[in-house]
Design a protein with these regions (language model features):
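Conserved pre-ATP/AMP-binding loop-to-beta segment of ANL
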Residues: 20, 150-184, 191, 215-221
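Conserved ATP-binding/catalytic segment of the ANL
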Residues: 391-392, 396-451, 468
Length: 551
């Protein structure tokens, strides 16, 4: 890619035309769409949009599990000039209703499981609801819109009477500062923020990928295992691959280590992108036992190198054996695992970013990365550390540049609080930068917890559910070494009046926990409860001093 902005939709258009007969999207162990077939489906969806009255700039919400047709829905919306609003499929129906309404979406793409829990009357702005597998209009508000469902082939034929080919592609031409999509960081009213991502931010992230991963080109195969609605997965398992002419496989099932390893062995991708949890599980189940068993041999010169090479080769082979490097991001990486991978010379790298930067802030190729760092600042970006000595004293990481978001949708106050007075994005992360420009993160200044697959978990949301229970005075949710734990200050006085001892009270809470978790996304399930003998330490404003309880 050139180092100068080009319309993202025109880049997609050119790629579709150039790779017309190549495979584009597949469901793992399922159907495959060529770039030509993908373009055909997009054109058909554009006809549906036109006939249903969708205009450029209207919002299109997408809430479904990972699937090739999820990508078709997103690309159809983007290339039409609409604004996609990807939503995590784990959100509860009430959350989906809220976000669809908050975003003022006119069209909603869903899968059949999501649709079962939704009530169209709760989403008054929505004109049409479309099932993604198979594509079918499930709900239409007007008779004219209902007519479209039974006449799509006829309407498509009217627009393309002879045939549909590469020369018919003419996608919406975007500009760098224009709003491309809205990505919600949460599903709950009062906590959700619609991150407005520009086309320039998407292009800039794709440009980084083209420079950092030149081996990713037309015909390369990639496995999409991250959540499609997550900015990390959307950018580096879909957008860039479509511009590069790659073949993307969607797992369409829970990405357990077993499923992922089987898919990687079958597909043999040119690049592996995943969250650290996958590697940590592989390390604990397969590598750690070997290391512990051979500790003596690791101390013998010559033998240790042979063992390291054997482990490296076996790990490389188990991940398909055809990739340039493994890119990890979306959550913190266990230092023990990372240092071992570095020691054996395994080709991995760790990037750093956030939804508000679409998502990349720093990155380095595996042969340049420093252990425990997150790389160096990405092209078109700058970072600084708010610290008297950025090399030794941790301070907030602040960023500015092309990747930075336009603001939070309909939330000027939150937008203003996200930037410094001189216009730098406040990331909420603490870090230092060494003399070579490598960023080392030291912790988070925000309350947000990163889930195992990179989802944003806001403890205040979970606490709001807990605090609604009659027996709870106040609560605090923490990440206890990967386990979401609720610290609860119960109503000891009321329990005493009712003759309930601590053990009985704990038993009652454990019985209520499944009902609490039913109100929360699958990635934000509370697994452990601990009682506080007395109230939490508080600030003068009566807020809990969270930092005292972190582990």
């Amino acid at each position: 890619m050139d180092a100068v902005f080009h319309s993202v939709n025109k880049l997609l258009e050119n790629s579709f035309r150039d790779n017309w007969d190549r495979p584009a999207l597949s469901n793992y162990q399922g159907t495959t769409l060529s770039y030509g077939a993908l373009a055909y489906r997009i054109a058909a969806m554009h006809v549906v949009f036109e006939k249903c009255g969708l205009k450029h700039g209207d919002k299109v919400a997408i809430c479904a599990r990972n699937h090739s047709n999820w990508a078709v829905s997103l690309l159809s919306s983007l290339t039409y000039g609409a604004i996609p609003v990807p939503l995590l499929h784990e959100f509860k129906p009430g959350n989906i209703h809220y976000l669809v309404n908050h975003s003022e979406s006119k069209v909603l793409f869903v899968d059949s499981v999501i649709w079962e829990g939704l009530v169209p009357e709760e989403m008054p702005d929505v004109q049409v609801v479309v099932n993604i597998d198979p594509f079918k209009i499930l709900y239409a508000r007007t008779e004219e819109q209902k007519y479209v469902q039974g006449h799509i082939i006829e309407l498509f034929g009217q627009k393309y009477p002879a045939y549909f080919g590469p020369e018919h592609l003419d996608y919406y031409e975007d500009t760098a500062d224009e709003l491309a999509l809205v990505s919600y960081t949460s599903g709950t009213s009062g906590f959700s923020k619609g991150v407005m991502i520009s086309y320039g931010a998407i292009w800039s992230n794709m440009y980084l990928a083209s420079v950092a991963e030149p081996q990713v080109k037309a015909g390369c195969e990639v496995v999409a295992m991250l959540p499609s609605a997550h900015m990390f997965g959307m950018m580096f398992e879909l957008f860039y691959e479509m511009v590069a002419g790659c073949h993307v496989y969607f797992l369409t099932r829970l990405p357990s280590p077993k499923v992922i390893l089987k898919a990687l062995a079958d597909i043999r991708p040119c690049m592996v992108i995943c969250v650290p949890l996958i590697f940590e599980k592989i390390y604990k189940s397969k590598l750690k036992p070997v290391i512990d068993k051979n500790k003596f041999f690791f101390m013998i010169p010559g033998l240790n190198k042979a063992l390291e090479k054997k482990i490296r080769d076996e790990l490389y082979s188990s991940l398909g054996g055809n990739f340039e490097e493994v890119i990890l991001g979306g959550a913190a990486f266990n230092p023990e695992v990372e240092l071992f991978l570095h020691k054996i010379g395994f080709p991995y790298t760790v990037g750093y970013g956030m939804t508000e930067c679409a998502p990349i802030i720093t990155y380095a190729h595996w042969d340049k990365i420093k252990p425990l760092s997150c790389g160096r600042v990405a092209p078109n970006m700058e970072i600084r550390i708010d610290s008297p000595d950025p090399r030794t004293i941790p301070g907030e990481v602040q960023a500015r540049g092309m990747n930075v978001f336009l603001g939070y949708y309909k939330n000027e106050d939150a937008t203003a609080k996200s930037f410094t007075e001189d216009g730098w994005l406040r990331t909420g992360d603490m870090g230092v930068i060494d003399d070579d420009g490598f960023l080392f993160l030291k912790g988070r200044s925000k309350c947000m917890i990163l889930g195992p697959s990179g989802q944003n978990i806001y403890p205040e949301e979970l606490e709001a559910v807990l605090n609604s229970l009659r027996q709870v005075v106040d609560s605090l949710v923490i990440d206890d070494h990967g386990v979401l734990t609720a610290l609860i200050y119960p109503d000891w006085h009321q329990a005493s009046i009712e003759g309930i001892d601590p053990e009985k009270l704990k038993e009652q809470f454990m019985q209520m926990l499944p009902e609490v978790n039913r109100q929360l996304p699958s990635y934000a399930q509370i697994r452990k409860i601990e009682f506080m003998p007395e109230d939490f330490e508080r600030t003068p404003k009566k807020s809990i001093k969270r930092y005292l309880y972190q582990r």
